[in-house]
Amino acid sequence: MGLFNFLFGKKKENTTVFLGVEEILPNSNDTEDLVVLGSVRGTIHVGDEVIITNLGSDNDKSAKAVISALEDANKGQVKKASGENVLITIKDGKKYNVYKGTVLHSEGVSEAKLRAAYLYAIINAFLFWQDGILTDEDRRRFSIADLIEIWRQSIRFCDTQATEKNYAYYLEKIIILMEQVRAKLLTLDEIYVVYSVKTGEPCLFMSSTRNQDGSLEPSELRVRLIPTVYKESMTYPEEFELRRVENGPNKDGISNFLNEVIFLNGAEGIEFISEVTSISAKALVKAPDLEGMREVDKPIMNPELVRCLLMIGQIGDTTTLGKRDRDFLSNLYLNRLTEALKTARFIVPIKVEGELPKPNEKGETSFAEDVKYELAMKELKDNKKAVPIFTDWKRFNEEYGDGWRGLLQPLGGPLIPHPVLINGTLYFETGNETKDSE
């Protein structure tokens, strides 16, 4: 089955007309007309007025234009045309934002048909007309949504249509698309992220398989990104919400966000729209080189620990999992949390007279008996108190400002013998008992 039927299904009688632009053909600079190549569903006529729609654009509005000429691959100049490889001349088309993937259509075409024409055009352009090579013009014109769709549909096409002989060929093209999406991401003005309402942090999504006994086999945990063009159409249960991440004038906001969710929150990658189109953390950002660095000099980051904290918080009473899976994952990440706590270093809010003593080689700090200091203390429900401790400087600085300093200590260190509250959410006391402070 060819790509056309793969996307559209079997041909049916059409009373409407639509096509996706697969190629822009060069023509004289003396004319404002634009010549494009596409596969027409229905029948298009010279003189027809069509709507120009860019499904992958964040801000393009639909426009109307007139078809001034048609050329059939077999018949030459014609007054009407349908089928594949039709040349369409759009009167004054150069003044519109027409590029590969633009859909020309009549009134009344369904969203599903518009999307099918769009996908057919961009896949055909990339995989077949261009042999899997993105041109400089493509890199400039394609939105991140366009690139993600080509990437996603190429994976689908490769999985269902590729043969053993050409599978490696298509896989190579898919890797190219992933790299282009990664590069495009860092240049955007904004991107939307799926957050967990309960934790207030970017939600960690898990794709998993099931073992023979029916238990889950979880894979890496990823943060889900949504291009702006999809933010209105994506729906999630009430336990999730979309939040905007701005790139800022220096175009470093998204990069900073990625560094935070990977190195501070423990995300193991990102995914766009769904798990199909994902990029691992190693392919996104470069990890700091800690080789040979003294423990005291290492940056305070506890990604494994925070990853477990966030997953325990997310799982809770989520409606997206059954009780058996919730219990299994809760125990899994609680066990991993217990292991991570053994080697974690925390930042403790403290007020002290004079200078803080320098920590030892292990990053631990101790005071002489005559030094006066005050540890921060949190009042919890049930008249309990706990010392707030933090997994990184970002979280510490968000809650404790002037007058407070950060002291580095392991859990159970000499200066924090009390029960502790990790990042304001997890209460911990002797016996490794943990629970949500709320």
Label for each model-derived stretch:
Residues 13-114:
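Beta-strand/loop-dominated core regions that host nucleotide or nucleotide-derived cofactor-binding catalytic loops
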Residues 2-12, 112-438:
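An interfacial alpha-helical scaffold signature
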